[in-house]
Amino acid sequence: MNVLDEIVLNTKSKLEVMKSKTSLEELISQATKLKIEKSNFKASLASKDQAIIAEIKKASPSAGIIIEDFDPVTKAKEYESFGASALSILTEEDYFLGSTKYLKDVKKIT
């Protein structure tokens, strides 16, 4: 089994556990209560001659920890100053050491 297969298998297992704890109806109910401003991803990419999607991640299965003193907000600001059109923020916890908190933190400054 390669790493990608392992990640998929692990993620499916975690999703099954989560689904057993919270119903789809409850998730939909929670999501509809959130006040999330929508962005236009396609327009962000189309607005420039060369669009760059910058990736924010602490680690990867192949490289291990990439940034020891990782701060997703600092990285987002850095990428923005370099002209990134959009951000890809890894939230997968086991292999990329991500967190959904990264999304919330970066959303506050973008």
Segment roles from a protein language model:
Residues 52-56, 87-89:
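Hydrophobic faces of well-ordered beta-strands that scaffold small-molecule active sites
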Residues 68-90, 109:
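Alpha/beta enzyme core
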Residues 36-53, 97-110:
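Alpha-helix-loop-beta-strand connector modules within alpha/beta enzyme cores
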Residues 7, 54, 79:
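Residue-level signature of catalytic and energy-coupling elements of molecular machines
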Residues 1-49:
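N-terminal positively charged helical leader segments and presequences
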Residues 56-71:
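Active-site mouth loops of central-metabolism enzymes
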Residues 58-60, 91-95:
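Active-site-proximal loop/turn and secondary-structure-junction residues that shape catalytic pockets
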